[in-house]
Regions:
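Conserved beta-strand positions
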Residues: 1, 45, 81-83, 111, ...
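Gly/Pro-rich active-site loop or hairpin
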Residues: 11-20, 54-65, 75-78, 85-152, ...
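Active-site acidic/histidine proton-transfer and metal-coordination neighborhood
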Residues: 1-78, 208-213, 234-236, 241-251, ...
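Acidic carboxylate-rich catalytic motifs and surrounding loops in phosphoryl-/glycosyl-chemistry enzymes
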Residues: 46, 155-159, 194-200
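C-terminal extensions of enzymes
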Residues: 165-258
């Protein structure tokens, strides 16, 4: 469900509080109807920052997640993020997918190519920000490094063939989407399986981040009593350590272009 009509060109033209209330009620009504009839359907909202409206409501994944959290029937409402739509707002598409996964709301995806903050280009997947496309595929195919929810849905491409293409070119551009995805998937699997990658992720504390703040059964009082967390914490030693972020990223790029 793409709310491309819902928005404004002029801030004076809408009671924004009322607009969000009606938007929420409309979604809840449709979601409630689906559930009341026992239909095996879910609603996937597709955020977009602008075009055709000057400012579209729910412009990003984060905005949509906030509204979904207010719904009475939000269990059947999730997200269908599009690569270009997040990148039109200057945002990281892979992060958007990750947050939707983390919230249990990644129902579908629309993959395509976008070259920066401009109109919605809908180019073939990977024909925009190639590095971002690589990490998107890495997440979709390999999951989070420390484990967690996985996307099990279709790999869907929402792109437009160039207006300069004839019928043969239209089909070639369709194949380009799938070819790019499969090539990136192979490279992403090789990247994750590489022992150097795993060593660098360890040094970068990627795996450590997967550890919860409190251990199983640990209480806030236990945490406060742990002197290693504050009183005996060696800030100088922590500050002097190397994280190898650039080396890890460069290693990913070697896999991508090697």
């Amino acid at each position: 469900m793409w709310g491309g009509r819902e928005g404004a060109e002029y801030d004076s033209s809408k009671d924004l509080n009322a607009a969000f209330n009606r938007y929420r009620e409309g979604l809840d009504t449709v979601a409630g109807y689906i559930k009341s009839r026992g239909y095996n359907l879910r609603i996937g909202l597709e955020p977009k920052p602008n075009e055709p409206r000057g400012d579209i409501f729910l412009p990003t994944v984060g905005h949509a997640l906030a509204l979904i959290a207010q719904l009475d029937n939000g269990d059947v409402v999730g997200l269908n993020p599009e690569t270009g739509h997040e990148q039109m707002a200057g945002l990281n598409y892979t992060h958007a997918l990750a947050q939707a996964l983390n919230a249990g709301k990644l129902f579908h995806i629309d993959l395509n190519g976008q070259s920066g903050i401009k109109y919605d280009q809908d180019k073939a997947f990977g024909h925009g920000d190639l590095a971002s496309a690589f990490f998107t595929v890495d997440l979709l195919e390999n999951g989070f490094p420390g484990g967690g929810p996985r996307y099990e849905g279709p790999r869907h491409f929402d792109y437009k063939p160039s207006r300069t293409e004839g019928m043969e070119g239209v089909w070639e551009s369709a194949r380009a989407n799938m070819d790019m995805y499969l090539r990136l998937a192979e490279k992403a699997r090789e990247f994750r399986a590489d022992p150097i990658t795993q060593e660098l992720m360890e040094e970068a504390s990627v795996y450590e981040l997967a550890q919860p703040t409190l251990d199983p059964g640990e209480t806030i009082d236990d945490f406060l009593a742990d002197r290693s967390a504050y009183e005996d914490f060696d800030a100088d030693a922590k500050g002097a350590r190397e994280y190898h972020y650039v080396e890890l990223y460069h290693h990913a790029m070697r896999h991508l272009i090697g």
